[in-house]
């Protein structure tokens, strides 16, 4: 089970999303996503991460005079099971993982690229995913 989406965002925050068919995990064929309901929950999560990170990077670049023209994210979601995981104690145990490859386009120095990469970790969605969040669910009274 694995999923892949690619997000591109220009300096005007125009965002495009492409996704691989989640039922064909070995396929690299991507299709344009026109509506969020075309994505699985994992695809929606990755789209949130990439889109949010893109906004953070473009906003930072604009405020600091960095010539960031476009940013794209190639995101892969997968589960790593105990047989592939040295830290998992039980064979039924797995860890969930998102790999995010960030590509930056523009007239950027190495220093600009390093700064933008550091800033990418300040995206609120990235923080929630890496730090965790408590969710308190209950039935509302009628």
Map each language-model feature to its residues.
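Extended beta-strand/beta-hairpin segments
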Residues: 1-47, 58-142
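Alpha-helical metal-binding/catalytic segments enriched in His/Glu/Asp
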Residues: 49-53
């Amino acid at each position: 089970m694995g999923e892949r989406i690619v997000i591109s965002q220009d300096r005007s925050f125009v965002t495009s999303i492409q996704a691989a068919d989640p039922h064909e995990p070995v396929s690299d064929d991507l299709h344009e996503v026109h509506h969020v309901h075309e994505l699985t929950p994992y695809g929606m999560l990755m789209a949130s991460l990439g889109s949010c990170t893109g906004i953070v990077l473009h906003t930072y670049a604009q405020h600091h005079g960095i010539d960031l023209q476009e940013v794209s994210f190639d995101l892969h979601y997968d589960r790593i099971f105990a047989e592939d995981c040295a830290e998992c104690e039980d064979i039924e145990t797995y860890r969930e993982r998102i790999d995010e490859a960030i590509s930056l386009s523009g007239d950027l120095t190495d220093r600009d690229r390093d700064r933008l990469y550091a800033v990418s970790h300040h995206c609120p969605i990235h923080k929630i995913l890496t730090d965790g969040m408590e969710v308190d669910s209950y039935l509302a009274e009628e």
